[in-house]
Amino acid sequence: LPIPEDDHDAYRRNQAQKAQWTRGHHGVVNVTLRPLKYSWEYIDGVKRPIRASRQEKGVDVLCALALVDLARSGRYDVVVLASRDTDLAPALDNAARTTRTKIEAVKWFDPADRRTRGNISTQAKIWTTSMTRDHFTASLDPRTYP
């Protein structure tokens, strides 16, 4: 999530999208927005974010925690992780090993891109569904957030 001081329009659009996705789905859909990490500079004595420095941080940790928490809650038969991030393998293994919940994964697959082949390497046998460019296109949010 860009900070308002850096990109007010993007900040506003992210907030509008979050509101749309959660509207009418209380307790079912949870959207967590994390502020991007910035380097800062002082211009004329005023601290300003450097846009080119912004980075997404901590999202993989949030995904890992959510996966394990949802699996351990006992409220779900299946928990599906949608990611290609290999850093999440320990969370997949932990959830599969310590709960009765079935753990699955979903990843994007492009036959023309060798980097998208294979699955996240885990000790547990995790069912992984490969989604194509058509699936990706169909999953896009068609709304324009003003």
Where do the protein language model's features map onto the residues?
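A charged nuclease-like catalytic/ligand-binding cleft shared by nucleic-acid processing domains
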Residues: 1-75, 115-146
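Active-site histidine-anchored catalytic micro-motif
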Residues: 58-62, 70-119
